């Protein structure tokens, strides 16, 4: 078992004027996680270690490199719907559930009461009417470009730090990741059902900074400044922070959940014992459904442990739909929004105790777990291989870990081997938290993550962003309009890699971008 000292996971006090408490990893000083995979024989484990070792040969593509998600990889032709295909090894018997989940993912929910009783319950406060509204064709959302427009595929998370000993203890016990605004809850909802005022509008302005690279090329970076306007229920709390979050792509989520804890934690180095300047930390959370301590993997700050938890969270916060895992039919409404709590809800007792009753949550979860990663393009092209070598040489792979092998003991609910079982995958992420510098800080604590900490996002499919979403928008708030801009925003632990990129020759820098676009 790996023992993580509690003193290595603390959050610095960032808010002046408030009693801020350190968040430790456990009251008993340590958390125990497995250090060795229990699903493999000794011989299998050695094979996995050999095949996942970083390559040193960039003269040719590695075996199976083009199949980024193993046997689940989609080899469908590139189109705007390339992120919407099922795991290639799903099988006809399970594709029916995938397509049912897809229909529910695209379903437009309506307010109550409605003649379509199985699909009512929207809101009362909400950000979008469907999952697909945020995850455009199962890809990334769009950032808000102009103040006053609905921020449909981007949300503002609201949170404050602990201000009482009891709240601090909740953080230490992982029973809370932060605390909502007293009036507006954990998220600003800029839409509402008829008869109710929306909470407010997202405002944004951008400032620009020009960066000159070593070869003389200039790149303009834009920094967003988000705020809230037209607040309907009074001001935000003085301690409330806001953080813009663009919806991420949906591909490969089931594979990410299938990576063994031990393999992720092997890359954690909170004390930087190897001296490379990288000190990735595990996100420790609770599985919302079971209440058990778990490894966070999903969300911009790795605040959710499972795909199901992520889906239930989105149903509740974004659409205002209750599920068995989050049964409140009023979503993010608070006691200071009393009219919201008197609006009709969509609970139909003959269907169940929640608005998304019966199989809805499991089907949308299954769909989300089985959106296939597309096969790579041009993996063997000389310029892409050169870019791959430059990616490694610049230090990018220190956080963007190229490959894993998923668990071999995964079963679906029907007892059959899960499609994600024992696959060699290439997500290019370590799924750990890293300090990304003040430039990307949102000042918002999320569990063991401070405002400067972000989960390393997987890079698979990143080269198809424009094709699927209709525009390029990278990083948590979509500020980066190109991959070059995204890299130049890296700071903190990633500053060395960022500077190495900025110092590359024009040809080397373009080769690295070509490599990323091939993913």
Regions found by a protein language model. Name each.
Residues 1-7:
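N-terminal secretory signal peptides that target proteins for export/translocation
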Residues 8, 23-27:
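N-terminal regions of proteins, emphasizing targeting and processing segments when present
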Residues 12-22:
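Bacterial N-terminal signal peptides
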Residues 26-519:
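Periplasmic c-type cytochrome electron-transfer domains
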